[in-house]
């Protein structure tokens, strides 16, 4: 199975609507970045993901450090990832990192980075 996982920071105060918007930003950013990339493997994964119902799992971490360390792991593994920074127009300071999106990619690869995390 191909899936996308969005990792949300739980150490910053965000309303439900803000969290939903940040998760949506991560998902859209990942898809657009893959479409605009030259990585054929990522494009294959995206196509499979689109035909599998676009599975998305939302999990949480307790710190910015956890977001950064997991992003570095995704980069090392050459997986699509996106770090989302808030624009600062409503609840948060500009540039606050709110979440990390990983995938779409094979479940076993994504799970090696996020499989230990609790669902949001």
UniProtKB/Swiss-Prot annotation:
EC number(s) per UniProt?
3.1.1.29
Q: Name one Pfam family in it.
A: PTH2
- Quote the catalytic activity from the record: an N-acyl-L-alpha-aminoacyl-tRNA + H2O = an N-acyl-L-amino acid + a tRNA + H(+)
Main localisation:
cytoplasm
> Which SUPFAM superfamilies is this protein grouped with?
Peptidyl-tRNA hydrolase II
Q: What class of enzyme is it?
A: hydrolase
Q: Where in the cell is it found?
A: Cytoplasm
Alphabetized InterPro entries for the sequence? Pep_tRNA_hydro_II_dom_sf, Pept_tRNA_hydro_arch, PTH2
Q: Which keywords does UniProt give here? A: Cytoplasm, Hydrolase
| Gene Ontology molecular function terms on file | peptidyl-tRNA hydrolase activity
Q: Which GO terms describe its biological process?
A: translation
Q: Which GO terms describe its cellular component?
A: cytosol
**Matches recorded under Gene3D superfamilies:** Bit1 (3.40.1490.10)
What does the sequence similarity comment in the record state about its family?
A: Belongs to the PTH2 family.
Oligomeric form and interacting partners: Homodimer.
- Role noted for this protein: The natural substrate for this enzyme may be peptidyl-tRNAs which drop off the ribosome during protein synthesis.
Record-linked NCBIfam families: arch_pth2, PRK04322.1
Name listed for the protein in its UniProt record: Peptidyl-tRNA hydrolase
Q: Which organism is it from?
A: Saccharolobus solfataricus (strain ATCC 35092 / DSM 1617 / JCM 11322 / P2) (Sulfolobus solfataricus)
Biological classification of the source: Archaea, Thermoproteota, Thermoprotei, Sulfolobales, Sulfolobaceae
